[in-house]
């Protein structure tokens, strides 16, 4: 209820930067891993 509650920070940019970093690295990684796994099954 108080604006100084540490459990509810108003530092949204921190979470935004973290979200961008996780998805920028995570989405392509999962995509390439899936593509490599698919190629392995296709060749066999």
Curated annotation (Swiss-Prot):
Cellular component annotations (GO), alphabetically ordered: photosystem II reaction center; plasma membrane-derived thylakoid membrane
Q: What is its main location?
A: membrane
Keywords from the named record: Electron transport, Heme, Iron, Membrane, Metal-binding, Photosynthesis, Photosystem II, Thylakoid, Transmembrane, Transmembrane helix, Transport
Span-the-membrane segments of this chain are 19-35
Q: Which Gene Ontology molecular-function terms are recorded?
A: electron transfer activity; heme binding; iron ion binding
Which example biological process does GO assign this protein?
photosynthetic electron transport chain
* Protein topology in the membrane: Single-pass membrane protein
Cofactor(s) named in the record = heme b
- Cofactor detail note: With its partner (PsbE) binds heme. PSII binds additional chlorophylls, carotenoids and specific lipids.
Q: Quick one: which residues bind heme?
A: 23
The subcellular localization recorded is: Cellular thylakoid membrane
Q: Give the InterPro entries listed for this entry.
A: PSII_cyt_b559_bsu (IPR006241), PSII_cyt_b559_CS (IPR006216), PSII_cyt_b559_N (IPR013081)
Q: Does the keyword Acyltransferase apply?
A: no
UniProt keyword annotation of Transmembrane present = yes
Name the family. Answer: Belongs to the PsbE/PsbF family.
Q: What does this protein do?
A: This b-type cytochrome is tightly associated with the reaction center of photosystem II (PSII). PSII is a light-driven water:plastoquinone oxidoreductase that uses light energy to abstract electrons from H(2)O, generating O(2) and a proton gradient subsequently used for ATP formation. It consists of a core antenna complex that captures photons, and an electron transfer chain that converts photonic excitation into a charge separation.
Assembly mode: Heterodimer of an alpha subunit and a beta subunit. PSII is composed of 1 copy each of membrane proteins PsbA, PsbB, PsbC, PsbD, PsbE, PsbF, PsbH, PsbI, PsbJ, PsbK, PsbL, PsbM, PsbT, PsbX, PsbY, PsbZ, Psb30/Ycf12, peripheral proteins PsbO, CyanoQ (PsbQ), PsbU, PsbV and a large number of cofactors. It forms dimeric complexes.
Q: Would you tell me the protein name for this molecule? A: Cytochrome b559 subunit beta
Q: Which organism is it from?
A: Trichodesmium erythraeum (strain IMS101)
Lineage at the top is: Bacteria, Bacillati, Cyanobacteriota, Cyanophyceae, Oscillatoriophycideae
């Amino acid at each position: 209820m108080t604006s100084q509650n540490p459990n509810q920070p108003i530092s949204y940019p921190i979470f935004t930067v973290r979200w961008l970093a996780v998805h920028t690295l995570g989405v392509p990684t999962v995509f390439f891993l899936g593509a490599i796994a698919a190629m392995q099954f296709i060749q066999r």
